[in-house]
A protein has these predicted regions:
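Short alpha-helical hairpin
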Residues: 8-34, 49-51, 173-182
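A non-catalytic, amphipathic alpha-helix used as a structural packing/dimerization or gating element
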Residues: 39-50, 71, 75, 190-197, ...
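Short, charged, low-complexity loops and linkers
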Residues: 1-3, 26-39, 116-118, 150-159, ...
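Acidic, carboxylate-rich catalytic segments that either coordinate divalent cations
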Residues: 190-228
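Active-site-proximal alpha-helical scaffolds that flank and shape metal-associated catalytic sites
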Residues: 6, 42, 65-167, 200
Length: 228
């Protein structure tokens, strides 16, 4: 069994809960409301403004294309990501760290801490749930060919059909398998936990979008970008 499969097995029902989250299932059923869809899109804007991958570049082995692809992704995400179409309505503040609601802020900080403290294998385990959108959304869309999606939803999913994103998933998975095979039992256990926790954080971002709510402690009535 490849180590990526061990990680998914370790995550167990959590991984399945992510793959079949109500937000995702509603999208593929053609029933996802514009409000729930745009909540997730707009809350992705603070992430697109970070430089998390650059922290990890010194840890990438020369034979892995992850750094090369992430440099290209940084350019692409700053110019063509569908999320950017929401900026005219919500304003540039939505790209700042202060616009992030708790679950989005949590996953960003989880990735940053992993990038600083972890190995390249750790980083790939922590981010795999995001790097695998080409499978979660792109491949599933091609297989199921759902109808009833809004034009913006189709445009967003089509991002993940781009072979470029499949390359990112492939090199991330390659690193997970390589490090999982070569490292110690202690490090493998850490990688499994990072995979699990990254998946749980991502579920949280979809929970927030599904519930249209993600309040900060003590906030009372939610305020800010896409709050309530």
């Amino acid at each position: 069994m490849k180590f990526i499969e061990e990680c998914k097995s370790f995550a167990g029902p959590v991984w399945e809960s992510y793959l079949h989250h109500p937000w995702i299932e509603a999208m593929f059923a053609g029933d996802l409301s514009d409000e729930r869809f745009e909540y997730w899109l707009i809350q992705d804007l603070p992430y697109l403004s970070t430089n998390i991958a650059e922290i990890a570049f010194p840890k990438v082995p020369p034979h892995n294309k992850w750094e090369e692809l992430q440099r290209e992704y940084k350019i692409r995400s700053g110019e063509t990501r569908v999320e950017l179409q929401t900026l005219e309505r919500v304003g540039d503040f939505a790209k700042t760290r202060w616009a992030a609601r708790p679950w989005r802020d949590g996953i960003i900080n989880f990735w940053i801490r992993t990038a600083y403290e972890g190995t390249f294998g750790d980083i790939c385990c922590a981010t795999y749930v995001c790097d695998a959108f080409s499978h979660t959304f792109g491949e599933r869309y091609m297989l199921e060919k759902p109808t009833g999606l809004s034009e913006l939803q189709v445009e967003w999913i089509e991002q993940w059909i781009d072979p470029f994103h499949e390359k990112i998933r492939a090199v991330t998975e390659e690193a997970i398998n390589e490090y999982g095979e070569q490292t110690t039992d202690y490090e493998r256990d850490k990688m499994r936990w990072l995979f699990l926790r990254g998946t749980q954080y991502q579920i949280g971002t979809f929970d927030a979008a599904w519930n249209l709510s993600d309040p900060w402690p003590g906030e009372g009535e939610e305020t800010g970008v896409i709050a309530g």
